[in-house]
Amino acid sequence: MSYQYSQEAKERISKLGQSEIVNFINEISPTLRRKAFGCLPKVPGFRAGHPTEIKEKQKRLIGYMFQSHPSSEERKAWKSFSLFWQFWAEEKIDKSFSMIDNLGLKENSGSIFIRELAKNFPKVARENIERLFIFSGFADDPDVINAFNLFPPAVVLARDIVVDTLPIRLDELEARISLIADNVEKKNNHIKELELKIDAFSERFDNYFNNEKSNLKIINELQSLINSETKQSDIANKSIDELYHFNEKNKQLILSLQEKLDFNALAMNDISEHEKLIKSMANEISELKNALTILCDNKRKNNELDYINELKKLTERIDTLEINTSQASKVSVTNRFTKFHEIAHYENYEYLSSSEDISNRISLNLQAVGLTKNSAETLARLTLATFVSGQIIQFSGSLADIIADAIAIAIGAPRYHIWRVPVGIISDMDSFDFIETIAESSRCLLLKGANLSAFEIYGAAIRDIVVQRQIHPTNYDHLALIATWKQGPATFPDGGMLAELGPVIDTDTLKMRGLSAILPQLKPGCLAKDKWTNIDGLQLDSVDDYVDELRALLDEAGFDGGTLWKRMVHIFYTSLIRVPNGNYIYDLYSVLSFYTLTWAKIKGGPVQKIEDIANRELKNYSAKISS
């Protein structure tokens, strides 16, 4: 097939102007248009297949076509334009359209081509053939006008189509008339039935009319009864309102009593265990006293050194058991739970059900602790995306605790819990106690100094919840998780395994307001949904392209964070894009900087390369915006 354009054809098309060429290209369906642009070279700095890249390709194609001097770019541009010309012909003429082989660029090749089309496609509108020739590569041919006359005008073609389909339409019309006639007959029968019913109704209405006075009296009595019932209803509604308010107060009281009962039940269980322990110790003391008596008797008989040493050991053991027994009786069961400090806000909190409400409340509380509005809004989106993902939002730096407190207040009503993690925990018992006894009724758990001990040891139960929430629903999908990192030689460097479970934000990089700024008050809020994923206002657009781009950048960096981490970072990125008022480039930069970098440090990955890629993407976007 020939795709060459003669010089005369190039001049003819160039005289039409760029707008006419753009209109010609836009007449092609978007699918074929995208296919044709896909054959053109990729434009640096643009994402492949993106509308902005297609627009830039079209701009460059037309620019090369209008070059006044021959060049390789000009020849490639005309060859590429011939592909648009072919797709236009396939849509406007026939899918089987193709060029005549070995036709060349002779003087009369245009008329030969048109006449050949007349043989193969006689029922094509003349206007389409003329437009096809105008944008073709053939030189102008005097005989081409005569060749155009072989095709009927669009008006004549439309008329012929109407004439050809007239018998079919007449048959359809006759069938519809027959159907309408049947319907009319049915309607007539129905009308007759209605007339009989109307006659019967008229007779009954006459009887009712004769009893008008009696009916009016009954109506007046009913009206009086309605008025009386209305007054009673108003009184009842007022009583219901009073009962509702009384019931709300009772609910709060019952909730408080239930918590105390649960706490007392746990205390009773623990007291029972201590009682068993004390009895066991008492029995052991009794046995030891008996043994001591036997030893004393033996001592009187035989004063050997072995018996003396054994006597001392038994005496020391008895003293120790007596001390332990006295101390065990004083141990309170609440010691197991006092490490989880409860913060309650049972009044003056607002229910939050949409992403906008939650983001605004978090942002306002962050501004209340000194952050600028832009920093607060950005951090609020990252925090909300983490909660929706079921992961742990983590903060490092000098402001970690105060920022974490502000966020916990924003979403933790009516109550949330703080765990100040001590140094050197070697058991996961505490975290399991929290999950089993407190987690279902708590709105948020804030781990302060989470890197002071090995999280993979003390936080096993919490990690299990985070991992499970990445795969299936749990009973704890309402629970928000926040962690802060401490600084100093006693901490685990770079957070340890915590960095796998959520983004880490360095609070020292956030912008703060001036010392003279008037700060708003912290306000408590409560999640109105049973799950973070059920909040209103999350965007539902497809994010597959963005996730593919993130995957490509991670492959470019050569970083494999593990199967679980890949799943978690993709879920977080998807949630972040779904939170309104974002920008996909800034979201991509946040994922690379706050999530990928921290985990790469733990895994010994290409930290510098990941940082360079994040800065490069942000720089390219900024350059594109400024151009």
From Swiss-Prot:
Keywords: Antiviral defense, Cytoplasm. It is found in: Cytoplasm. It comes from the Bacteria. GO terms for biological process: defense response to virus. GO terms for cellular component: cytoplasm. Disruption phenotype: When this gene is missing the Druantia system does not confer resistance to SECphi27 in E.coli. Component of antiviral defense system Druantia type I, composed of DruA, DruB, DruC, DruD and DruE. Expression of Druantia in E.coli (strain MG1655) confers resistance to phage lambda, SECphi18, SECphi27 and T4. This is Druantia protein DruC. The lineage of its organism: Bacteria, Pseudomonadati, Pseudomonadota, Gammaproteobacteria, Enterobacterales.
